[in-house]
């Protein structure tokens, strides 16, 4: 069953292999990232003030290239727990408008986000290596 969003319903998959700015119509979509080619990718989230209740999941469909990072950016903080699946370590991200998958992150690395109208909350995040907060 499709999930409702502002002005309609959605629940589709969206492929991402280049810089992408998400729209309100992308609410509920699962983004499948393809960072298999060299070169960083930035996924920009919608403005928080117009996105209360907006949810998205971003998953690497293939392993990142050794020279590729996939960064998710917002106009405000992205907060919550992040788990490093390789070491089992977890970290609580308290501030910062960017989170992402590092060079050579493996397929299946994921982050699920929801907006409360003031910030983005991490509902679930796991990667085989530590997540990044900026492109390098």
Which role does the model predict for each range below?
Residues 49, 100-107:
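Extracellular beta-strand-rich solenoid/capping regions of secreted or surface-exposed proteins
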Residues 92-102:
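A conserved acidic, glycine/proline-rich C-terminal tail/linker
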Residues 106-116:
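Extracellular disulfide-bonded cysteine-rich modules/repeats
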Residues 1-88, 119-136:
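Exposed extracellular interaction/assembly regions and N-terminal maturation sites
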């Amino acid at each position: 069953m499709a999930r409702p969003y502002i002005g309609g319903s959605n629940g589709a998959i969206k492929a991402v292999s280049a810089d992408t700015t998400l729209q309100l119509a992308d609410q509920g979509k699962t983004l499948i990232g393809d960072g298999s080619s060299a070169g960083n990718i930035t996924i920009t989230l919608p403005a928080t003030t117009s996105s209360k209740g907006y949810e998205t999941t971003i998953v690497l469909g293939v392993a990142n290239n050794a020279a590729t990072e996939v960064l998710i950016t917002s106009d405000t903080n992205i907060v919550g727990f992040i788990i490093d699946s390789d070491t089992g370590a977890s970290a609580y991200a308290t501030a910062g408008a960017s989170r992402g998958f590092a060079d050579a992150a493996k397929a299946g690395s994921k982050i699920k986000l929801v907006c409360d109208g003031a910030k983005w909350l991490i509902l679930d995040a796991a990667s085989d290596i530590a997540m990044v907060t900026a492109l390098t």
